[in-house]
């Protein structure tokens, strides 16, 4: 049996050890850090680029917060208590030993992120009328 197959078999038979890749939350925290990085740098980008509107900034922030909320939702469903990291990991001076937050704390952050995001993401017009595009090419 290949190593990956063994890890999956161990996962399904509840013979789980900490270095089993099927139980790693590293990929979730990579995505969370990317979202936090967007939230950290996007306001500065908008301030420097006159073509990057505040509406676009808010939409991008809402998307990042929504994706971060989804990651935390999956994490607490799987692990219950997880570290709640809301700042981007930039540089080496960051404390990498973050205490695990309670499930309630993480749920409150998920709700806060989604409540904030709903005003900027759900009412956007994502599709362009074909007739508008047609005028561009005539």
Residue ranges and their predicted role:
Residues 2-79, 95-108, 114-130:
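Conserved, well-structured interaction surfaces
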Residues 88-95:
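Short glycine/proline- and charge-enriched loop/turn segments
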Residues 130-138:
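Aromatic-lined, polymer-binding surfaces characteristic
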């Amino acid at each position: 049996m290949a190593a990956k197959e063994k890890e999956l078999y161990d996962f399904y038979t509840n013979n789980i050890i900490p270095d089993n890749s099927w139980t790693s939350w590293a990929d979730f925290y990579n995505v969370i850090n990317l979202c936090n990085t967007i939230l950290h740098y996007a306001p500065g980008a908008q301030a420097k680029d006159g073509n990057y509107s505040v509406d676009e900034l808010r939409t991008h922030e809402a998307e990042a917060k929504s994706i971060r909320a989804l990651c935390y939702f999956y994490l607490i469903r799987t692990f219950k208590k997880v570290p709640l990291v809301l700042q981007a990991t930039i540089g080496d001076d960051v404390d990498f030993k973050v205490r695990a937050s309670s499930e309630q704390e993480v749920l409150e952050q998920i709700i806060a992120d989604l409540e904030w995001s709903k005003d900027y993401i759900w009412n956007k017009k994502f599709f362009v009328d074909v007739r508008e595009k047609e005028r561009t090419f005539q």
